[in-house]
Amino acid sequence: MAKKTVTRIAKINLIGGQAKPGPALASVGINMGEFTKQFNEKTKDRQGETIPCIITAFNDKSFTFVLKTTPVSNLIKQAAKLEKGAKNAKTIVGKISLQQAKEIAQYKLVDLNANTVEAALKMVLGTAKQMGIEVTD
């Protein structure tokens, strides 16, 4: 039996429970029908969320994938009830509470390059600032 070798590693953002075969998946070189079936099954409880996914494709068209947590910017927009952030970071377009920022940091801790909630909170606060979202006590 020939050894499987990795042919491609792709990072794509998909909507939970709504993955469809398309150009983004076609370029990875995997069985798109099988991937979308497995992805939609694993993400049925996260309908409508943007979910980053890392797909590892092998030379025999098989694959593995890892699901990450929703991006911080999406969580901040959801907490501030906004469609999008500011074009200029100096323009304030919304507010979130420090408690909401802590909840986002706690949720994202598993995927962030941080060891403590405080370090993750600093990352969340930096993202909010760049989006024009004010964090209030």
From Swiss-Prot:
<dbReference type="InterPro" id="IPR020783">
    <property type="entry name" value="Ribosomal_uL11_C"/>
</dbReference>
<dbReference type="InterPro" id="IPR000911">
    <property type="entry name" value="Ribosomal_uL11"/>
</dbReference>
<dbReference type="InterPro" id="IPR036769">
    <property type="entry name" value="Ribosomal_uL11_C_sf"/>
</dbReference>
<dbReference type="InterPro" id="IPR020785">
    <property type="entry name" value="Ribosomal_uL11_CS"/>
</dbReference>
<dbReference type="GO" id="GO:0070180">
    <property type="term" value="F:large ribosomal subunit rRNA binding"/>
</dbReference>
<dbReference type="InterPro" id="IPR006519">
    <property type="entry name" value="Ribosomal_uL11_bac-typ"/>
</dbReference>
<dbReference type="GO" id="GO:0006412">
    <property type="term" value="P:translation"/>
</dbReference>
<keyword id="KW-0689">Ribosomal protein</keyword>
<keyword id="KW-0687">Ribonucleoprotein</keyword>
<dbReference type="InterPro" id="IPR036796">
    <property type="entry name" value="Ribosomal_uL11_N_sf"/>
</dbReference>
<dbReference type="GO" id="GO:0003735">
    <property type="term" value="F:structural constituent of ribosome"/>
</dbReference>
<dbReference type="Pfam" id="PF03946">
    <property type="entry name" value="Ribosomal_L11_N"/>
</dbReference>
<dbReference type="Pfam" id="PF00298">
    <property type="entry name" value="Ribosomal_L11"/>
</dbReference>
<dbReference type="GO" id="GO:0022625">
    <property type="term" value="C:cytosolic large ribosomal subunit"/>
</dbReference>
<keyword id="KW-0699">rRNA-binding</keyword>
<keyword id="KW-0694">RNA-binding</keyword>
<keyword id="KW-0488">Methylation</keyword>
<comment type="function">
    <text>Forms part of the ribosomal stalk which helps the ribosome interact with GTP-bound translation factors.</text>
</comment>
<comment type="similarity">
    <text>Belongs to the universal ribosomal protein uL11 family.</text>
</comment>
<dbReference type="InterPro" id="IPR020784">
    <property type="entry name" value="Ribosomal_uL11_N"/>
</dbReference>
<comment type="subunit">
    <text>Part of the ribosomal stalk of the 50S ribosomal subunit. Interacts with L10 and the large rRNA to form the base of the stalk. L10 forms an elongated spine to which L12 dimers bind in a sequential fashion forming a multimeric L10(L12)X complex.</text>
</comment>
<protein>
    <recommendedName>
        <fullName>Large ribosomal subunit protein uL11</fullName>
    </recommendedName>
</protein>
